[in-house]
Regions:
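Surface-exposed helix-capping loop/turn segments at secondary-structure junctions
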Residues: 57-64, 131-141, 178-182
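Acidic/histidine-rich alpha-helical segments that form the ligand environment
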Residues: 109-145, 154-166
Length: 197
């Protein structure tokens, strides 16, 4: 009888400890996901500010200029960013139909003004961020096919963030080429400051 009681108490204690550990792990995972999303949104917002600044520097005619036949205009890149966010974040994470027509993003040679492109981008980003923010933990871990690749929801967040940064860099480079000026993104910031613990 005493052996059975001891075994039952040990099992209860293990279950209680296991539950506490599981609760801590779930809490840490929740914190990790919240931190990942917050930092992704920070990068997305930073890139939006830079991209908007570039578009505002350019003339309407500059928006559809291509550096060469093998490169895209700022207008094409913005349409491409909208398509990518729509396919990956809005359709995939939002569990809606994928209606992207990728080739049209690159074949366009006009049709949108600077302000229309920025509005289209801003609206797309706000919808994507809302969906990302409301995506469940299960959906963030679930694997799915997007554009022929297999991604988890977390992988999708990383992809749209880095993809946006990559193309924002192209827009910055092309704007500097066209305008021959420093865009002042880091004005007043000491980028030589050393790390602190």
């Amino acid at each position: 009888m005493a052996d059975t009681t001891i075994k039952r108490n040990v099992a209860l204690l293990k279950n209680k400890i296991g539950s506490l550990i599981l609760k801590q792990i779930k809490g840490m995972i929740g914190e990790f996901i919240a931190e990942l999303i917050a930092n992704s949104f920070l990068r997305i917002d930073e890139n939006t500010q830079k991209l908007t600044s570039c578009v505002n520097e350019l003339e309407e005619a500059d928006i559809w200029k291509r550096p060469n036949p093998h490169s895209n205009s700022v207008g094409n890149i913005i349409l491409h960013l909208c398509g990518n966010f729509r396919q990956y974040a809005i359709a995939s994470l939002g569990n809606s139909n994928d209606v992207r027509e990728r080739d049209k993003e690159f074949s366009a040679d006009g049709g949108y003004s600077k302000s229309e492109l920025l509005k289209k981008l801003t609206d797309t980003l706000e919808e994507a961020k809302r969906i990302i923010q409301n995506t469940s933990g299960e959906e963030l871990l679930r694997k799915r096919k997007v554009q022929g690749y297999t991604h988890s929801g977390i992988g999708i967040i990383i992809h749209v963030t880095e993809h946006y940064s990559y193309h924002t860099g192209q827009i910055i480079f092309w704007t500097k080429q066209l305008k021959d000026k420093d865009l002042g993104f880091y004005a007043g910031i000491d980028l030589n400051a050393k790390n602190e613990a």
